[in-house]
Amino acid sequence: DHLDLHSFPTRRSSDLNHDIVILTGGLGPTNDDVTKLSLAEFFESDLVSDPQVLKDVEEFFLKRNLGLTEKNRNQALVPAKAKIIRNRYGTAPGMWFDANEKIVIALPGVPFEMKNILEFEIIPRLKNRFSGTCVVQKTVNTLGIGESFLSDKLADWETNLHPQIRLAYLPAAGIVKLRLTAKGQNEEFLNSIVEAEIQKLDPLISKYIWGFDNDTLEGICAALLLQKKQTLTTAESCTGGYLAHKITALPGSSQYYKGSIIAYSNALKTKLLNIPESEITGYGSVSKQVVELMAINGCKAMQSDYCVAISGIAGPGGASIEKPLGTVWIAVAHKENVISAKFQFGDQRHTNIVRSAVAALGMLREVLLK
């Protein structure tokens, strides 16, 4: 945001200490976007207008029927010493500088723009540049066990990992991923040692493993539903449609997903899901009895083969001594058969919503696999 703050610690490109430096952000059209100016100063390079970038910017605004300002045109001003990396998702191009056998890369700060350029442009170029080194990665996705408990279970296995393999624990809301990375000269050998370690890992935590690499729970459930030629609906309370959002984010979900009943209030639980008021009064809306009825009646209302129901206390209000913040009940019904489980999450509303949806998909997967 300020030129002095964005300047490199050293003042000459020959002083760079790292082989690769990647910067994100500050490439936009506003006055606080000064990364481009800092790089021009650092590499002692004039700013010049790049015809391809200007064309991309003009087409970007034309497609959206938006007027083009001088500030927008200035997006095409780039340091003359930079190799331009086209941004097909926005207006700020990426920039690649070669200096004294070092590489400096500047990418837009908008996450999806940065991610796409990194994945489809930067990583392939870096692999080509450093083709002598092979990197093999495999990710094991787990559910239902925390990072520290997982680490305890795997202590001996981790201690005896092949010396060329590095392990990383990558926790997210309700999920922990184990990433194994091997580096060396022989890709076939690296694949073999990674696969051997996963074969040792599987019996230790098999009940927690649900997928690998880029698998998603919603994707696995989708494949199982399509395989069975069966349909799904959801009945949501505390998640407010977030589970439906995850399911419908997949293209083709209309082939198996019928829709969602978002019964946030008790009145709608009674009206739309036919939950007797006596059940809600007697047990509370966050209860085994109510969530199971939500799932069973959701199947009936939507005429679907399966229904996943969620009811909980996302917070920050609504908790009691009996039902503290983060209490969530989830049920999965298949016709008249239903299973349910109680979860105790934390005190952060959004995290509780995300973890509820993840846990619900995990339960659905288990039912579909039976």
Predicted regions and their residues:
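Short, small-residue-biased leader/transition segments that mark boundaries at the very start
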Residues: 1-13
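Proline/glycine-rich low-complexity loops and linkers
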Residues: 12, 33-129
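Accessory alpha-helical/coil subdomains and C-terminal extensions
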Residues: 98-174, 179-181, 189-194
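Flexible gly/pro-rich beta->alpha loop and the following alpha-helix that scaffold active-site loops
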Residues: 23-46, 201, 205-212
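Conserved N-terminal alpha-helical segment that immediately precedes and caps sugar-phosphate-binding
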Residues: 11-12, 32, 57-60, 147, ...
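Short, structured active-site "lid" loops
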Residues: 12-23, 280-288
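Glycine-rich beta-strand-to-loop/alpha-helix junction loops that act as flexible
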Residues: 23-31, 108, 183, 310-313
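Short alpha-helical segments enriched in small residues
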Residues: 187-370
